[in-house]
Amino acid sequence: HSEARILHSKDRTGAEIEGALEAATSGEGMTGLVIKEDWMAIDIIQKRHEDPLSGICGIWCLKPDGVVETIRGSAVILATGGCGMLYNSTTNPTIATGDGVAMASRCGADIRDMEFIQFHPTALEGQERPFLITEAMRGHGAVLMTVEDHIRWRKEGGLASDYSYMKKYSPMGSLGTRDVVARATDAELKMSGESHVLLVTEHLDEDSLRDSFPTICKRLDEQGLSLGPDPIPVRPAAHYLVGGISVDRFGRGLKDGEVIPGLYAIGETACT
């Protein structure tokens, strides 16, 4: 953007949103709201089996003790996220298994555009589960280089951005759009045979980096790496499900364009 206009909380925006929601739902005045931790939704209950347009009347859940319990209700809202665990490398948590989409499909809802998956271009390499390195870091001035680019830059000197492979793929260089950067990085890795590229921050102020990206710094410290002195090994990883449950503008689940009474889908699990 020509002006910085994205609302964020350093590199912990998601955690801050989650914390605010947790605080709001656990405070006084939230009568009628019951949170069931470690319960797993198994399936949606239809008013008439195999008749999606008859409507929804609840869900079946698997309790931690292995007992299945019925929860009745006039509406079910699916907010189960994406399906990143289908991929070998993903930034998603282990619970992102696409169960909400599967449940909606089994009760007759239309599912759209599941072939479209967004890949984040900079996930920390060498982790059991890739750790997302925010794009804000490239906005801060970090530059993507191949291992060979980095060796050449250290030897010859000059502007770090002049040595980035991204110059071949986008006039914006390392600030290219997420899809362009992810595809470019994948292409470079296939050509080089390397397992990762490097996110270079050596040319940036270390104190400013630590102030702006405390969570990332903490994770890198655990790996024996430091923003500033060390190039960070990164590679693309599955990040966001673009498709999902077909809904209208009110989030109501659809079957052949008709509303399924009582079924709603919001967030990543919906296709909006």
Q: Where is each model-derived feature located?
A:
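Conserved redox-cofactor binding core of oxidoreductases
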Residues: 1-67, 72, 79, 120-125
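A glycine-rich dinucleotide-binding beta-alpha-beta segment and adjacent secondary-structure elements
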Residues: 36, 42-57, 62, 212-270
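Hydrophobic alpha-helical segments, especially N-terminal targeting/anchoring helices
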Residues: 62, 107, 145-147, 158, ...
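Short hydrophobic core segments
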Residues: 70-81, 104, 263-265
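Flavin (primarily FAD) binding-site architecture
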Residues: 78-92
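Glycine-rich phosphate/pyrophosphate-binding beta-alpha loops
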Residues: 86-89, 119-125, 238-239, 270-272
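An anion/pyrophosphate-binding glycine-rich loop and adjacent beta-alpha core
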Residues: 103, 109-233
